[in-house]
Swiss-Prot record:
It catalyses: tRNA(Pro) + L-proline + ATP = L-prolyl-tRNA(Pro) + AMP + diphosphate. One of its GO terms (cellular component) is cytosol. InterPro entries: aa-tRNA-synt_IIb (IPR002314), aa-tRNA-synth_II (IPR006195), aa-tRNA-synth_II/BPL/LPL (IPR045864), Anticodon-bd (IPR004154), Anticodon-bd_dom_sf (IPR036621), Pro-tRNA-ligase_IIa (IPR002316), Pro-tRNA-synth_IIa_bac-type (IPR004500), Pro-tRNA-Synthase_IIa_type1 (IPR023717). This is Proline--tRNA ligase. One of its GO terms (molecular function) is aminoacyl-tRNA deacylase activity. GO terms for biological process: prolyl-tRNA aminoacylation.
Length: 571
């Protein structure tokens, strides 16, 4: 490809509204342009990368035995009503009506459509297992689109759906897709981790996310220092402390704390160690208990894990904190003064709090706390659960080593759905005994457009993008110095361009009438892995200059050897 016949569209300045590196560089490198909030046009350079991600994903999913199909982006609303997800999805599900006032949605995912398809097309166990996938545009009406294509409203996604006769078959399909994901991300040259995850709105039981590791990642991932255990912060189990609760050494005393509205203020003003404090959080209760509110009690230096809380039978979903008005109506005190002693509401205690002694907590009276609280003596312990986020140094749930935390960008997710959708939509087949059996489903997604942004977050420097070879828009750049003034430079560049392209190598030939500095800057910004510089001075010495984008090293290579040198670099 010649730059003179290509839409390069690079920018010198970083747009003001681009927050993260990938968004900045995708705009500057001429990969995307914003059309509206969360909507982007993919320019030629960006589309070349997107297609490479697509092709790698397609090849590995095909190799796993899945079959490609294509489903409509527009879906009948009635299918979503069958599964009950029409309400669970909330405003992210874009609803509209056609001219006949029939309700439809723009597809954020396709569990309902694929289940309806299999319900109609597959009738016998002899047709199973089957795994169908598509690479298709999706739409989620994000409340706050941000970070470019990382959190856009319209995005490209590979979504696959497996159907099996039993759980053993589902587990086999799930593992095959897990392995296919690993092969795809390995081929892309990305540093990633598969981690245990919560199933969220999709439903089902077993679930893993695939995260590209990057400091800018929105998600926090917990890893064992001595095993392969990995989980996102929502799923990582905070293991119960392996210590006995110490015997009381203090009497419980009521302390005036008029200016201590937070744990930090309590610690600063009264000299109590933060590890000896607890936070009492009031949340809306589910229908499983009679009380309107349930209290969750965690250590003062820990954070509530909302997903773990939502998964408790006693807690309403989605998690909703009680209002100040509700707190006062129930106990006569507000946030900052709540605690377990004398509390007339059901409460659940975190594992780390269950082993505490001589601790401080709100007295359920404004401006007062109890110090020296002990379980059993001053208040009954009651229900204990894992309520908190893990922290670095916690024991690993696998029993090996401790946890370390890193940031990651979720680019893929796999689920063992079970029969959540197939049962709701009566999707079954006749087994070998002629009995109708509801199918076991798995669903699998890769955010294709998100992978592009995640790869940039992991591979960049102050000059621009540093693409892994497998994802680069072009493999090689040819930069001829002052080509329009030197006939032999032009001839050498044209000859090399013809040779490399004839070999199937993707080359960007910069034939613009531009200063060398501009040409070099653009090639580095775009992130082409291998650059060949052709100039009169180097040709006088019988060589071209080869530059590696990742290492930055420049190497003189004999003109006669340059093609073989490039072939060796591309292996």
């Amino acid at each position: 490809m010649r730059t003179s016949k290509y839409l390069l569209s690079t920018l010198k300045e970083t747009p003001n509204d681009a927050e993260v590196v990938s968004h900045q560089l995708m705009l500057r490198a001429g990969m995307i342009r914003k059309l509206a909030s969360g909507l982007y046009t993919w320019l030629p350079t960006g589309l070349r990368v997107l297609r490479k991600v697509e092709n790698i994903v397609r090849q590995e999913i095909d190799n796993a035995g899945a079959i490609e199909t294509l489903m409509p982006v527009v879906q009948p609303f009635e299918l979503w009503e069958e599964t009950g997800r029409s309400e669970k999805m909330g405003p992210e599900l874009l609803r509209f009506t056609d001219r006949h006032v029939r309700p439809f949605v723009l597809s954020p995912t396709a569990e309902e459509v694929i289940t309806a398809l299999v319900r109609n097309e597959v009738s016998s166990y002899k047709q199973l297992p089957i795994n169908l996938y598509q690479i298709q545009t999706k739409f989620r009406d994000e409340r706050r689109p941000r970070f470019g294509v990382m959190r856009a409203r319209e995005f490209c996604m590979m979504d696959a759906y497996s159907f099996d006769i039993d759980k053993a078959g589902l587990e086999k399909s799930y593992q095959a897709m897990h392995d296919a994901y690993c092969k795809a991300f390995d081929r892309m040259g990305l540093e990633y981790r598969p981690v245990l995850a919560d199933s969220g709105a999709i439903g089902g039981n077993g679930s893993q996310e695939f995260h590209v590791l990057a400091e800018s990642g929105e998600d926090l991932i917990a890893f064992s220092t001595e095993s392969d255990y990995a989980a996102n912060i929502e799923k990582a189990e905070a293991v119960a402390p392996a210590v006995e609760r110490a015997a009381p050494t203090q009497e419980m005393t009521l302390v005036d704390t008029p200016n201590a509205k937070t744990i930090a203020e309590l610690v600063e003003q009264h000299g109590i160690a933060i590890e000896k404090t607890v936070k009492t959080l009031f949340v809306k209760a589910s229908d499983a208990i009679e009380a309107p509110i349930v209290a969750l009690i965690i250590r003062g230096d820990h954070e509530l894990n909302e997903i773990k809380a939502e998964n408790l039978a006693e807690v309403a979903t989605p998690l909703e904190m009680a209002t100040e008005e509700e707190m006062r109506e129930l106990i006569g005190a507000g946030a900052g003064s709540l605690g377990p002693v004398g509390l007339k509401l059901p409460f659940i205690v975190d594992r780390s709090v269950a082993v505490m002694s001589d601790f401080g907590a709100g007295a359920n009276i404004d401006g007062k706390h109890y110090f020296g609280i002990n379980w059993g003596r001053d208040v009954e312990l009651g229900q204990v659960a894992d309520l908190r986020n893990v922290v670095e140094g916690d024991p690993s749930p696998c029993g090996k080593g401790t946890l370390m935390l890193k940031r990651g960008i979720e680019v893929g997710h796999i689920f063992q759905l079970g029969n959540v959708y197939s049962e709701a939509m009566n999707c079954g087949v006749l087994d070998s005994n002629g009995k109708n059996v509801i199918l076991e489903m798995g669903c699998y997604g890769i955010g294709v457009s998100r992978v592009v942004a995640a790869a940039i977050e992991q591979n960049n420097d102050k000059y621009g993008i540093i693409w892994p070879d497998a994802l680069a828009p072009f493999q090689v750049a040819i930069v001829p110095m002052n080509m329009h003034k030197s006939e032999r430079v032009q001839e050498a560049a044209e000859k090399l361009y013809a040779e490399l392209t004839a070999m199937g190598i993707e080359v960007l030939f910069d034939d613009r009438k531009e200063r060398p500095g501009v040409m070099f800057s653009d090639m580095e910004l775009i992130g082409i892995p291998h650059t060949i510089v052709i100039g009169d001075r180097s040709m006088d010495e019988g060589h071209f200059e080869y530059k590696n984008r990742r290492s930055g090293e420049k190497t003189p290579v004999a003109m006669a050897d340059i093609v073989e040198h490039i072939k060796a670099q591309l292996k």
